Structures are given as structure tokens and as C-alpha cells.
Regions:
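Conserved pre-ATP/AMP-binding loop-to-beta segment of ANL
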Residues: 21-43, 50, 73-79
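Beta-strand->loop->alpha-helix junctions that form or flank phosphate-binding loops
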Residues: 2-8, 196-202, 222
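ANL superfamily adenylate-forming
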Residues: 1-35, 142-164
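Conserved S/T- and glycine-rich ATP-binding loop of Class I adenylate-forming
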Residues: 38, 44-47, 80, 85, ...
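Conserved ATP-binding/catalytic segment of the ANL
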Residues: 224-292
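Conserved AMP-binding A3 loop
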Residues: 39-63
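Gly/Ser/Thr-rich phosphate-binding loop
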Residues: 126-129, 138-216, 229
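Conserved AMP-binding/adenylation subdomain of ANL enzymes
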Residues: 62-79, 86-160, 194
Length: 293
């Protein structure tokens, strides 16, 4: 099913909505849904290789949303911008399922990435997230305008810059999907916008770790979400066990078994360290590549 294209062999969303299946009972169908039923498929290559269809369930997505809500300032009535591809687990799960359905926030969708800056000023999001490349571009734009070191501005000046960015109402700035450069983190911290870096993957319904607000440690991806277990193998590979772990790869038992062991631990492929306070740092990749934008 495609949203905004037509072609041979494609079913458009409009056609799907207009279709009628004889004898289909919507009321009975939705009431028959169980927590372990698949709610969505996220296609991922795991950075390289043939695509895999990650099966996320109603239970795994709800666990992810509730765990994030327990430790981050997601307030009802807030505002978010959807601009990442909906194939991205962050946009689909955190924005459309989490912010809109679970948290009761308004979501404004922006199809043209060139309009993001204008949308930020118009929407004034209360939560704004992006991959590191987004934050790098915002930093580059401010530097091009002459703001080399925002930490030297008086508080009134910082507030003015935040307002011009459209982030003056933002209580949570998130960076994820790849490591953010330290200079980017420090730049926005100097502006009064602490980037909350987290770690996760499609197979984990998005985030498994985040930095606690008020206790952000730059260079780390934070601590495990409530209810999430972390473990390191002897080679440093980070393993995760929690209700947010995927059901498996659709119709691919071999690769499912390679990722999920018999005890329910998901093998992430990332090499990490965990300090005495529970903060995780990703230091290497056991296999494949890290995507940074």
C-alpha cells in the first residue's frame, strides 16, 4: 500500500479506504486483537544486507511509549513535528503512535524537508527530535549567522535565539539513530537546549536507553528505560531483554534466531560499556556499519 504514488501492482491508500470487503465486521475485528498481535512492520536492513521485516506488537509499542512517558517530559497537549520518513521507527512509533495516540499531542506532518525550519517557528514544538545530521545543520545555520559560541550570550539573548529557532517552548530535545558529535551537544547545551541522546533500534520498538532529564551525561546514550534489562557479553556486545523487543523478523526464522536467543535476549551487534551508575556508552560495532543520518 502506498500513500502518494500510483503504478502497476500498487494499491493506493485512497483505494484501500474506498474498498469494501463483503462480510467484514470491523467491530468484531478490533475487539479480537490481542496484545501479542503484530501492529506494524518496520523494514530494516540492519545497516547492510537484504531487508528484514521487524514485527512490532501492540504490547511492545505500548511498553515503549509508557516507559518513555515515565522518564521524559511528554505532556498531554504538547506539539511535535513529523518529518522523518514514516518507514523510520522513530517517526512511526514515537511520533504517530506515541505522541498522537498515547500522549494526546498534536502532530504536524511536514513532507518537504526544506520547510522544517519554517515549520518549527510556526508549530513551536514542545518535543523535537532528530538524527545528528539535523542538529548539525541547525548548528551550521546559526554559525553562518555569526553565532559561534552561544554559551557567551546573556540569558535573554539565548531565549531570543531559541524563539527564532521555534524551540522556545521545547521541553525535550532528542537526538538518536547515531552518535552525536560532542561539539554539537555542547553547542546546544550552551544555548540552553540540552540534547537528550538515546539508543535503540527498530527491533526494540525504538529507544531502549535515554539520558534522564536533569542528569544528562554527554557522550553516553543514557540509562535503560524502566523495565528494560541490559547485559554485556564478554566481547562487550550489548544485549537487551524487555517487553519492547520485537516478536521476530516476519517469515525469517533463521535471522530471528541469530538476533533473539532462547532466553529472550536481543543481540544488538553494538559494543558498549556500562558504568557504575548505569550509563551506557556505545564504543564500536560488532558487525556491519553505523548509519549517521
Amino acid at each position: 500500500v502506498v500513500v502518494d504514488a500510483v503504478g502497476h501492482g500498487l494499491l493506493t491508500l485512497d483505494d484501500l479506504e474506498r474498498s469494501h470487503v463483503r462480510g467484514f465486521d470491523f467491530e468484531a475485528a478490533w475487539r479480537a486483537v490481542e496484545p501479542d498481535d503484530v501492529v506494524t512492520l518496520i523494514y530494516t536492513s540492519g545497516t547492510t544486507g537484504p531487508p528484514k521485516a521487524v514485527q512490532l506488537t501492540h504490547a511492545s509499542v505500548l511498553f515503549e511509549c509508557r516507559a518513555l512517558q515515565a522518564c521524559l517530559p511528554y505532556q498531554s497537549g504538547g506539539r511535535m513535528i513529523s518529518y522523518l520518513p514514516s518507514a523510520h521507527v522513530g517517526d512511526r512509533v514515537l511520533v504517530h503512535y506515541g505522541a498522537s495516540i498515547c500522549f494526546g499531542q498534536s502532530v504536524v506532518s511536514v513532507a518537504d524537508l526544506r520547510q522544517i525550519a519554517a515549520a518549527m517557528v510556526e508549530v513551536r514544538p514542545t518535543v523535537f527530535g532528530g538524527v545528528p545530521r539535523v542538529w548539525e545543520k541547525l548548528k551550521a545555520g546559526l554559525e553562518a549567522a555569526g553565532l559561534r559560541d552561544p554559551s557567551q550570550l546573556p540569558e535573554a539573548g539565548k531565549a531570543l535565539v531559541r524563539a527564532r529557532l521555534g524551540l522556545d517552548h521545547c521541553t525535550l530535545c532528542v537526538s538518536g539513530a547515531a552518535p552525536a558529535a560532542m561539539e554539537v551537544m555542547q553547542y546546544f547545551s550552551g544555548l540552553g537546549l540540552s540534547l537528550n541522546e538515546g539508543w535503540g533500534m527498530s527491533e526494540l520498538s525504538c529507544f531502549a536507553t535515554v539520558n534522564p532529564p536533569g542528569d544528562i551525561r554527554m557522550g553516553s546514550v543514557g540509562k535503560a528505560l524502566p523495565g528494560v534489562e541490559l547485559r554485556l557479553l564478554d566481547d562487550g556486545e550489548l544485549l537487551v531483554r524487555a517487553p519492547l523487543v520485537m516478536k521476530g523478523y516476519r517469515d525469517d526464522p533463521q535471522r530471528t534466531a541469530e538476533t533473539l536467543d532462547a532466553d529472550g535476549w536481543l543481540h544488538s551487534g553494538d559494543i558498549a560499556t556500562i558504568d557504575g551508575d548505569g550509563y551506557v556508552r556505545i564504543v564500536d560495532r560488532k558487525k556491519e556499519l553505523i548509519i549517521n543520518s
